[in-house]
Amino acid sequence: QNKPYEINISLFDALQGTTAGPDSWGVERFVCAHAIMLALEGIPGIYIHSLLGTRNDYERVENSGHYRAINRHQWDYDALVSELSREESSHSQVFARIKTLLEVRRQQAAFHPNATQFTLHLGDAIFGFWRQSMDRRQSIFCIGNVGNEPLPLALADINLIGTDDWVDLISGQHYHSREQVIEIAPYQVL
């Protein structure tokens, strides 16, 4: 009996659309998925092709005769350096943004692998959870719009402490009032 071993597609290409078909949110959707993964409890693992936003390698499938080769591209060093140096390249955009997310994670005590985590219930298209450092001195609310429409978010809905100033660790945006309602762009993570 045949059983599927794996999905034969690169993760980057798998996230280039929804059930409605391909769309223009591919890079944003891909980075959103990684931002959520990097903020979750535990020790994250990142496949090199996710770090680089590697697309399906159809030529490798054809040459090897193995479908699983589709997500096992072998980069030529000079070609990779060239792609990463072009700001408009999806590879460059993904690499820079995931590096930023890794740095944010590294700097925050609440992202310790064993730090507390609780899921927030904020609606169907908003994925959220709360992380708290092991010494309980830092709280981080990770909020991601996992849909392709902008969504309002009332800061009061995530139980922010009213006397604290809150900062989006990715954008640097400050929020001074828990009464604020902010708009989260499609696939944006705060």
Each predicted region: which residue ranges?
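Loop/helix patches that line or flank the sugar-binding groove of alpha-linked glycan CAZymes
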Residues: 1-140, 144-151
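Short, surface-exposed beta-strand/loop "edge" segments at domain boundaries and coil↔beta transitions
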Residues: 136-138, 173-177
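Beta-strand-rich binding/interaction modules
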Residues: 149-171
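C-terminal beta-strand-rich structural cap/linker in extracellular carbohydrate-active enzymes
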Residues: 176-190
